[in-house]
Design a protein with these regions (language model features):
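C-terminal transmembrane helical hairpin of 12-TM major facilitator-type secondary transporters
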Residues: 305-348
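Helix-loop-helix hairpin linking two adjacent transmembrane segments in secondary transporters
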Residues: 127, 156, 165-210
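Paired small-residue
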Residues: 111, 115, 126-134, 328-336
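Helix-breaking motifs and short loop linkers at transmembrane-helix boundaries and internal kinks
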Residues: 68, 100, 121-127, 155, ...
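Juxtamembrane intracellular "pre-TM" segments in multi-pass secondary transporters
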Residues: 22-32, 213-245
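Conserved MFS/SLC helix-loop-helix module at the cytosolic interface between two early adjacent transmembrane helices
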Residues: 87-125
Length: 417
């Protein structure tokens, strides 16, 4: 996946939280030079973040061969990053509340870029995993804070537009990271591929630092563990939020598992695809640029529950197509699966804001935590099924998760309609 969650923003609540002054509140409006600087900075940050996070996914077979590890062990290079990102989300959001948005994001992106460059020098598998863990932990500082910065600084009338550009950067970054690493690995080596992506991300971090305006509406708050715990308990006692968290876990777990191991399958007989062609399969992600807004329009007409269930079913249909031996059917299945995932995920994530009674930012962080935890756990477990049962085993594992997502989504719709 490489896409960031689309979270509902309540502009009114942001405005009310601003300090009272005798001067009118100045937000950044569309069409101004500052708006262009903000959108360019956040777009490039989102692109770099998800390129760094997912660049290893298409080269998992290469890492398996070079370091002599199993597919399940190779997938840990991605799972450990998403797992540490999930854990970091619980801390970097509150940290940015205390010390500032821009400082956290700039530091996070620079650290992740440097760790990616260092990973190209590692000669042991454990060294690779340490670097990948640090990359995931660092990137949580961008994932947790980017949307908060936009909701604080952009005029409420243009928040949705700027958020859309930011999310586009995330999705394009996830695709380009996979695409570049696959192609460069095929023509050069995986070390050169990661070095190129690391240098690009470092340049993005420097540009981000230079052009992103300082926060005007940020007010530092002290870290209060007691308040965080009270809100945490409130969210888990809600009749809908825990089901949404579980839905995010299952959807992302299914998505990452399919793309982790489809490359292994297609590099075998009878297809024998090259590493570059496996990387090119990430263009399937582009279906999300159509399906996500389509899901939003359908939600306004039919409601969140039915639309989420429909697109989860689309994922299941796409998965079934990948079980055939025709390459065209497999790719069609990947297109359907990706379209269904991005649409279902956007509906689930947009449900968080309206459901949370307070501390909506923390509720969104808990959703993202569950989302990336699903990527980490399911992405690794899929390797066990691949090793023991081949693609049919992986497909069965994903099908179980999607059926569970349908059951959870059905109960969610029944409870909240």
């Amino acid at each position: 996946m490489s896409r960031t969650t689309a979270i509902d923003i309540d502009p009114a609540s942001d405005i009310d939280d601003l300090p009272a002054t005798s001067q009118p509140v100045q937000f950044i409006k569309r069409g101004t030079p500052q708006f262009m600087r903000v959108t360019l900075a956040l777009f490039s940050a989102g692109l770099a973040t998800f390129a760094l996070l997912y660049c290893v996914q298409p080269i998992l077979p290469v890492l398996s061969h070079e370091f002599g590890v199993s597919p399940a062990s190779s997938s840990v290079s991605l799972s450990i990053s998403t797992g540490m990102l999930a854990i970091g989300l619980l801390f970097t959001g509150p940290l940015s509340d205390a010390i500032g948005r821009k400082q956290v994001m700039v530091t996070a992106l620079m650290l992740a870029s440097v760790c990616t460059l260092l990973s190209t020098m590692m000669t042991s598998w454990h060294g690779i995993l340490v670097m990948r863990a640090l990359i995931g932990l660092s990137l949580s500082g961008v994932a947790a804070v980017g949307m908060t910065y936009l909701s604080e600084e952009i005029h409420p009338s243009f928040v949705a537009f700027s958020m859309g550009l930011y999310i586009s950067g995330n999705s394009i970054g996830g695709m380009s990271g996979r695409l570049l690493s696959g192609v460069f690995t095929d023509f050069f080596s995986w070390r050169i591929a990661l070095a190129v992506i690391g240098c690009f991300a470092l340049a993005s971090a420097l540009m981000f630092w230079k052009i992103l305006p300082e926060s005007r509406h940020f007010r530092p708050t002290s870290l209060r563990p007691k308040t965080l715990f009270i809100n945490f308990r409130l969210h888990w006692r809600d009749k809908g939020l825990p089901r949404l968290f579980l839905t995010g876990f299952l959807l992302m777990g299914s998505f990452v598992t399919l793309f982790n191991y489809i490359g292994y399958r297609l590099m075998l007989s009878p297809w024998h695809l090259s590493q570059a062609l496996v990387g090119l399969l990430s263009v399937a992600y582009l279906t999300g640029t159509w399906s996500s807004p389509k899901a939003g329009a359908m939600t306004a007409r039919y409601g969140r529950g039915p639309v989420m269930l429909f697109f989860t079913s689309v994922m299941l249909i796409g998965l079934l197509l990948t079980l055939f031996s025709s390459l065209w059917l497999i790719f069609a299945g990947m297109l359907l699966f990706s379209a269904g995932f991005f649409a279902a995920h956007s509906v689930a994530s947009s449900w968080i804001g309206p459901r949370a009674r307070r501390a909506k930012g923390q509720a969104s962080s808990l959703y993202l935590f569950s989302y990336y935890l699903g990527s980490s756990i399911a992405g690794t477990l899929g390797g066990v099924f691949w090793h023991s049962y081949g693609w049919n085993g992986v497909g069965g594992f994903i099908a179980l998760m999607l059926c569970a997502a349908l059951l959870v989504g059905g109960s969610l719709h029944k409870r909240l309609r």
